[in-house]
Design a protein with these regions (language model features):
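Internal amphipathic alpha-helical repeat/solenoid segments
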Residues: 309-328
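Extended, well-ordered alpha-helical scaffold segments
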Residues: 146, 257-280, 291-298, 340-354, ...
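Short glycine-rich loop/turn motifs
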Residues: 105, 297-300, 315-319, 349
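Active-site-adjacent bridging/hinge elements
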Residues: 210-218, 298-312, 352-362
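Terminal accessory carbohydrate-recognition/targeting modules of carbohydrate-active enzymes
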Residues: 1-284, 319, 326, 337, ...
């Protein structure tokens, strides 16, 4: 587990460049900085893969929280916006951040006045859904919590302006609201919440959010998000409160896909994801080696299931690229063999075997779901290397039999073509 305590979190300038990423196993992903601000175009709470593992769209950017207690207002939002001249405007909610942890899921812990709040996020496995669990302990008088979801709909490497973010937007029956993008009327972005009340916002657009890494790369780095509602909650005096917030994207239909969550629904879903990562650590066999187990979890972020084959593949260039053949074969041993994911390794070899054309392994599956591109001469040679590495590590008769039946004919085809 990566764990960063409060004394290392206060510096906005340094920590906005320290980042986390988590994925959902079908090409979707989430990411941000460890202080809660977005730092790149390719970040947000839910970048959904509409045709796994490609066609990736940002649909849910982040949430901003604000606590009120008596005359005190605690703005937990951490963000950077473009200012006049060269000086950005920074909202520094990280001053209330006491802990950040990441182990396949991420958790931000805050302390403000008499209130302690944990905000825990996870992507559900093989689903374009994010779960957020809030656990709040109020040790003082009655308080209030406001959560502002920032929504979007754009290709994950693009940016949005107000004119791009036009939606049909309505409250739904599951405690949140539903968005249908004008740019994709067949899709529905659905947000649900276990409690709270919806309040329409006067200012429905968060404009000129600035991504520092994009600025460092000499682009404007500006983006706009749609925030139609605040969710508001009462935190009784001397109480503990649990809140579940979920967001998903799916084809338009008459009824919500999500049911209204219970207070602990998100926490239960997050626990399932944590159990998944625990099982990967156990399978890898590194025992109590914390560093090795961190690498096992990190390796999983690059593996995804491809719809066109129903098999596993590797997104070695995440988030920028999809399953490029050359990069996949180079990363193959570290991501699957060193982690003892032998079944996934076989599927990855078979995925690329199915796309060999005139002896060439595809070098690129385009992000828009078009036919693969064959534009590298050495990906096929790296494929031989990956097959050899697989047999050296596994070495069982059944493994040799699998390669002989499913892969060897393709190897012969490659040799003949070369």
């Amino acid at each position: 587990m990566i764990h960063i305590p409060t004394e290392k979190l206060a510096d906005f300038e340094k920590n906005i460049r320290r980042e986390w990423t988590m994925t959902n196993g079908i090409g979707g992903y989430a990411g941000g900085s460890i202080i809660g601000a977005c730092n790149r175009t390719h970040q947000g709470y839910l970048i959904a893969s509409l045709h796994p593992p490609v066609e990736r769209y940002l649909v849910f950017s982040k949430t901003n929280e604000k606590l009120t207690q008596g005359t005190h207002v605690y703005n937990l939002e951490t963000s950077q916006h473009a200012g006049k001249g060269h000086s950005p405007i920074r909202t520094q909610g990280q001053r209330f951040l006491t802990d950040f942890s990441c182990d396949g899921t991420v958790c931000f812990s805050y302390s403000a006045g008499n209130i302690r709040m944990d905000k825990h996020l996870a992507l559900l496995r093989e689903s374009n859904t994010v779960a957020i669990s809030y656990t709040i302990t109020n040790q003082g008088e009655e308080a209030g919590l406001s959560i502002t979801p920032l929504m979007n709909f754009r290709e994950h490497s693009a940016s949005s302006a107000v004119s791009d973010l036009q939606f049909t937007c309505e409250p739904n029956t599951v405690g949140g609201f539903t968005l249908i993008p004008a740019a994709a009327p067949g899709l529905c972005i659905e947000l649900s919440c276990s409690a709270g009340r919806l309040f329409p916002r006067e200012n429905q657009y968060d404009v000129d959010m600035q991504y520092q890494t994009e600025v460092d790369n000499e682009t404007a780095g500006l983006d706009t998000h749609f925030c139609p509602y605040d969710l508001r909650f009462t935190l009784p005096a001397h109480s503990s409160t649990e809140i579940s917030l979920l967001c998903t994207v799916h084809p338009v239909q008459d009824t919500p896909v999500l049911s209204r969550p219970q207070a602990d629904t998100a926490a239960i879903e997050i626990a399932h994801v944590q159990e998944y990562y625990d099982s990967l650590k156990q399978q890898a066999g590194y025992g109590d080696d914390a560093f090795a187990n961190t690498l096992v979890v990190a390796a999983d972020q690059f593996l995804a299931r491809r719809d066109s084959t129903g098999l596993m593949t590797i997104l070695a260039g995440l988030p920028w690229f999809t399953d490029w053949g050359r990069d996949t074969m180079i990363a193959f041993s570290g991501l699957t063999l060193a982690t003892r994911r032998f079944s996934d390794a076989r599927e990855i070899l078979l995925t690329f075997a199915q796309y060999v054309h005139h002896g060439m392994v595809p070098n690129m599956f385009p992000d828009d779901g078009q036919d693969p591109l064959y534009n590298t001469a050495d990906a096929s040679l790296w494929y031989f290397y990956a097959v050899d590495a697989y047999l050296k590590v596994t070495g069982q008769p059944s493994d040799y039999d699998y390669i002989q039946r499913r892969i060897y004919p393709v190897l012969r085809e490659i040799i003949h073509a070369y």
